[in-house]
Amino acid sequence: MDKAEYQSRLEELNSLVKKEDYEGALAVVEAVDWRRVKSLRTLGMVADVYEANKRYPEAKKILLMAYDRSSIGKGILYRLVEVSVKMKDFDEAIDFYNEFEAVARHDNSRYLLKYKILRGQKAPLEEQISLLEEYKEREFTERWAYELANLYSKAGETQKCIDACDELILWFSEGKYVTKAMDLKMKYEPLSPSQQIKYEHRFDYKKNEEPSEDPEALKVRLAGESGAGEMAATKEPAETPEVKPVNGGVMSQYVAGEEEKEA
């Protein structure tokens, strides 16, 4: 495949992903041999497409390719933990987490990764709560504040749940997780007058202002030279990848050996 054809494929893929047409994007992804691509951003997008289609082994293989090409690997390790948890491969998730912690010892998102592993393992609620409480001491974000309140509810810690909901509503005022917190609180007691007013106007905020991902996790996945965002760091290769048949499937093994690396 020449460079023009590859660029056409890449533009089509970008367009489909932007429209969130991940089923259509999958057909494009499977028509290209990505082993010869150096761009971490592009490989990250390919992994996104596989992940959106619940093709976790393929997503993991692409992420391992990206990790092999990365000088830092922090953001890719974060995603490898997430994908391994979705595959219920907790041994590998823990291995990737340990690698992440080694290069991001002071990054608060390590608490989120560890929590996701515990949640996937269905660990006791007390352990999950303890970890999110540690995270909350360092970062107070809507999504995980609500998650903690919900865990309190599941654990039968009603007053802690109510207090956590009140705190979230007070600090963030509006948005998806504020509405969820108000719904959760109303299972146990009525909203305060000011909260009731917020609840009645809950659809007034603009949906496009709602973050699609927790800011701390997003920072790790997409940031630049700080170590979290290798996905946007490199240029496309001068030599373009080969197209493979759409029905040809993907390799069954993960990246291994020099023969699968870009020279």
Residue ranges and their predicted role:
Residues 44-51, 64-68, 72-140:
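Alpha-helical adaptor scaffolds
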Residues 25, 59, 93, 127-128, ...:
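Single-residue signature of alpha-solenoid repeat helices
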Residues 19, 53, 87, 121-122, ...:
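Structural motif corresponding to the intra-repeat A-B loop/turn of tetratricopeptide repeats
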Residues 69, 102-104, 157-177, 182-208:
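TPR/TPR-like (Sel1-like) alpha-helical repeat modules
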Residues 196-263:
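Intrinsically disordered, low-complexity acidic segments enriched in Asp/Glu and Pro
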Residues 11, 45, 79, 113, ...:
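"A position-specific structural signal for the A-helix of alpha-solenoid helical repeats
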Residues 7, 40-41, 74-75, 109, ...:
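Start-of-helix register in tetratricopeptide repeats
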Residues 11-15, 49, 83, 117-119, ...:
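Residue-level signature for tetratricopeptide repeat
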